[in-house]
UniProtKB/Swiss-Prot annotation:
InterPro entries: JSRV_Vpu. Pfam families: Borrelia_orfX. This is Protein Vpu. It comes from Sheep pulmonary adenomatosis virus (Jaagsiekte sheep retrovirus). It comes from the Viruses. The lineage of its organism: Viruses, Riboviria, Pararnavirae, Artverviricota, Revtraviricetes.
Length: 166
């Protein structure tokens, strides 16, 4: 997997930190969470979507992922993704990681919240549908870019054969 553009990565971290500042938590706790997230995104197979998932959960004030919770979540996610979950083409290895991470997050939410089970199951179903929608969108956009690139290459072939320098 190719690394993400550094500017996009930095923007995500800034947005995440801004979301995290809403909580009445001491600064060292915020910095610890932020540092762990940066390390997680850098070293967990480029799973940059962790930032969005974390920001979504914390901004919803369902729970605050501490250093220990996020560490356990990452370990559980890593163990689960050793086995292929989806063999369908849009579900790449990175998408599998994100899906399992979301499922783990909802499992932790189930433990922490006192909502009725039906509401939590509705949230899980919505999360799964949202993941499928995002992955399909990425796949369709990627296919469109491949078609555009292929057409551009085919269109440029006669020019390249003439060895014209611009």
């Amino acid at each position: 997997m190719q690394p993400e553009n550094p500017m996009i990565y930095i923007t995500k971290i800034v947005i995440l930190y801004a979301c995290n500042l809403k909580f009445p938590v001491k600064l060292h706790g915020k910095l610890l969470n932020l540092a762990l997230l940066v390390l997680n995104s850098l070293f967990s197979l480029n799973m940059v979507s962790t930032l969005e998932v974390y920001a979504l959960i914390t901004s919803g004030k369902q729970m605050l992922l501490t250093f220990l919770n996020l560490g356990v979540l990452n370990m559980f996610m890593f163990l689960l993704t050793l086995f292929p979950i989806f063999s369908w083409l849009p579900f790449t290895l990175e998408n599998q990681h994100v899906t399992v991470f979301n499922i783990c997050c909802f499992a932790f939410l189930l433990q922490e919240s006192h909502k009725p089970l039906k509401q939590i199951m509705d949230l899980v179903i919505l999360a799964v549908l949202f993941n499928v929608f995002v992955f399909l969108s990425k796949f369709i956009i990627k296919q469109e870019f491949l078609i555009i690139h292929r057409d551009k290459v085919l269109w440029n072939e006669p020019i390249n054969e003439l060895n014209i320098n611009y």
